[in-house]
Amino acid sequence: MERLATCACSELRVTCSGEPEKVSLCHCPACQKRTGSAFGIAAFFARENIRVEGASRSYERPSDSGFPVLLHFCPGCGSTVFWEPRRKPDMIAVGVGSFADPTFPAPSQAVYAEFRHPWVGEMASREGLPFGDQQG
C-alpha cells in the first residue's frame, strides 16, 4: 500500500510505502508550535519506505532527547510535511494531517501528556457541540 502526503499547495509530496511503524500523538510545546494546534500527530515510516518529490526548506531544532530534529517544509506554502528525528536516523516522521485521509490509522501512543490542553479529549464526546461538514 502507498500513501501520499502533501503540503497545502501540493508542491512537496511524500509517498510512503507500507504501514507506519507507529503513529504518535504528541502534546509537547514544540509540536504545538509546529502545527499551530493543541497537538501534533506523526506517522513514523522506515526511511527506505519514503520517497520525497519537490523542493523543501528545512529547520533544525533541539529536542528533549538531546538529539536535534530536522523539519522539512514547503518553500511555497510553508506547510511542514515531514521531519527527521536524529535520534532515530532510520525513520522519517510524516505529519498525519498531510495525508488528508480520515481512514489513516489512529495513534498508538500519546506523549508529553503534561502539556495536554485540558479540553483535548472532551471535545470528541461533548454533547451539543455543533458538528458539520464545513466550517461555519
Specify the residue positions occupied by each region the protein language model found.
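A short Gly-Trp-Pro
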Residues: 1-136
